[in-house]
Amino acid sequence: MSFTDTPDGFRSGFVSFVGRPNTGKSTLTNALVGEKIAITANQPETTRHPIRGLVHRDNAQIIVVDTPGLHRPRTLLGERLNEAVKDTYADVDLIGFTVPANEKIGPGDRWILEAVRKVSPKTPILGIITKADSVSRDLVAAQLMAVHELLGGNSEVVPVSSTSGENVETLIKVMTDLLPEGPKFYPDDHITDEDTNTRIAEAIREAALSGLKNELPHSVAVEVDEILPDPERNGVLAVHAIIYVERVGQKDIIVGHKGQRLGRIIHTSRQDIIKILGQNVFLDLRIKVLKNWQSDPKALNRLGF
């Protein structure tokens, strides 16, 4: 039996999570997949491209598309990210509108909902209250009612905690019921369709973002140059990658005092890269200044945006 052979009544489809930056979309994606495929950080606007995570059940296959948070762009990169998100909305079967339990609904949420409905007016919307373990049950109930009122109609709303796992299976069941009948798109052993270089670059960027403040996190980009067998170490892969920043002062911050910060980035990301490649790794990481790359069309094209 091939992975394309599916039982009667099998459901499948694409679900996109939308919401303001830092509402827990990437953490929720990881919880649903059961493995880390999307990087997470305390800074908003961490996700920079749609990431597909695969959720497998006996009666369904759900392709979760984790997108960058919709925001009012300040750079050409921001504009391109918003366009990529809107393109994603138009191609999915279900939209999960995420609102954190610990923040009141505001103008940003309404702006996003309006943008989603403008781009994809016929796609059903499911309300998802994230971070449900961060507040009392009374506040979760109040947020549930507020989101239901915002969405209107017969829209369902599910509170969920990605960290404790509370209601994760309930959310999967609700999403399954809202998807059409269809085939399996991927084999059961696949958890993402991300290519290896992208996953490695994201692992390095996640380590680099740790502890950064203000605007510096937005100025960090990573490019994997090449992956080759290490000529000096048997059974080891040499991963050569570049961290780009926009100014010389930012480079100094990434390197840190006597290179200590760069050393931590290499140590942390190397552990994730070993898991991705399933092999021991030597990580060669360089830092380069690519001036104002967030607003430079050529630089953005080079970095895949």
Swiss-Prot record:
It comes from the Bacteria. GTP binds at residues 19-26, 66-70, 130-133. CDD domains: Era, KH-II_Era. Residues 130-133 are annotated as: G4. Residues 11-181 form the Era-type G domain. Keywords: Cell membrane, Cytoplasm, GTP-binding, Membrane, Nucleotide-binding, Ribosome biogenesis, RNA-binding, rRNA-binding. GO terms for biological process: ribosomal small subunit assembly. Residues 45-49 are annotated as: G2. GO terms for molecular function: GTP binding; GTPase activity; ribosomal small subunit binding; small ribosomal subunit rRNA binding. Residues 66-69 are annotated as: G3. It holds the Pfam family MMR_HSR1. The keyword Hydrolase does not apply. Residues 212-291 form the KH type-2 domain. InterPro entries: G_ERA_dom, GTP-bd, GTPase_Era-like, KH_dom-like_a/b, KH_dom_type_2, KH_sf_prok-type, P-loop_NTPase, Small_GTP-bd. HAMAP family: GTPase_Era. Belongs to the TRAFAC class TrmE-Era-EngA-EngB-Septin-like GTPase superfamily. Era GTPase family. Monomer. An essential GTPase that binds both GDP and GTP, with rapid nucleotide exchange. Plays a role in 16S rRNA processing and 30S ribosomal subunit biogenesis and possibly also in cell cycle regulation and energy metabolism. NCBIfam families: era (TIGR00436), PRK00089.1 (NF000908), small_GTP (TIGR00231). This is GTPase Era. It comes from Corynebacterium glutamicum (strain ATCC 13032 / DSM 20300 / JCM 1318 / BCRC 11384 / CCUG 27702 / LMG 3730 / NBRC 12168 / NCIMB 10025 / NRRL B-2784 / 534). The lineage of its organism: Bacteria, Bacillati, Actinomycetota, Actinomycetes, Mycobacteriales.
